């Protein structure tokens, strides 16, 4: 499920209009991916218009097994994709690793 203007962050899975990623960045990943005030290429590379399933995450989500299962229990309230099709570019993954951030693709290919 997706629409033309909605995109899902490939790192955290939050769903927002593309304009929101450009204007405000990602509420969870901005310090890592720097969407805000960046060129559209960063948003194009690190978000996907193709995603499946929706989960609404509220303010008090610590007890939610769904939030824990999707690994979004520490993220800000909003709509999240269950699955985000696509993967971050290798250069972005390398930058994340330099910051000691482990990237788990949200496309279903990661195994625990």
Curated annotation (Swiss-Prot):
Gene Ontology biological-process entries: filamentous growth of a unicellular organism; mRNA processing; regulation of DNA-templated transcription; transcription elongation by RNA polymerase II; transcription elongation-coupled chromatin remodeling
Q: Where are the zinc fingers (C4-type)?
A: 9-29
Family matches, as InterPro entries: RPABC4/Spt4, Spt4, Spt4/RpoE2_Znf, Spt4_sf
- Which Cys pairs does UniProt list as disulfide-bonded? none
Tell me where the signal peptide lies.
none
**Subcellular location, record wording:** Nucleus; Chromosome, Centromere
Q: What is this protein's function per UniProt?
A: The SPT4-SPT5 complex mediates both activation and inhibition of transcription elongation, and plays a role in pre-mRNA processing. This complex seems to be important for the stability of the RNA polymerase II elongation machinery on the chromatin template but not for the inherent ability of this machinery to translocate down the gene.
Example GO CC term: the record gives: DSIF complex
- Subunit architecture: Component of the SPT4-SPT5 complex. Interacts with RNA polymerase II.
Identify the keywords attached in UniProt to this record, alphabetized: Centromere, Chromosome, Metal-binding, mRNA processing, Nucleus, Transcription, Zinc, Zinc-finger
Q: Which gene encodes it?
A: SPT4
Q: Kindly provide the name given to this protein in its UniProt entry.
A: Transcription elongation factor SPT4
Q: Is Acetylation set as a keyword in this record?
A: no
Query: What's the source species for this entry?
Result: Candida albicans (strain SC5314 / ATCC MYA-2876) (Yeast)
Q: Name one GO molecular function term.
A: zinc ion binding
Which family is this sequence assigned to?
Belongs to the SPT4 family.
């Amino acid at each position: 499920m997706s629409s033309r203007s909605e995109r899902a962050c490939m790192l955290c899975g939050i769903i927002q209009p593309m304009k929101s990623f450009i204007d405000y960045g990602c509420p969870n990943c901005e310090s890592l991916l720097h969407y805000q005030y960046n060129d559209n290429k960063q948003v194009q590379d690190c978000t996907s218009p193709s995603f499946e399933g929706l989960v609404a995450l509220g303010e008090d989500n610590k007890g939610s097994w769904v939030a824990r299962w999707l690994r979004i229990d520490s993220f800000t309230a909003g709509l999240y994709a269950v699955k985000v099709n696509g993967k971050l570019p290798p250069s972005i993954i390398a930058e994340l690793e330099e910051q000691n951030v482990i990237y788990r693709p949200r496309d279903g290919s990661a195994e625990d």
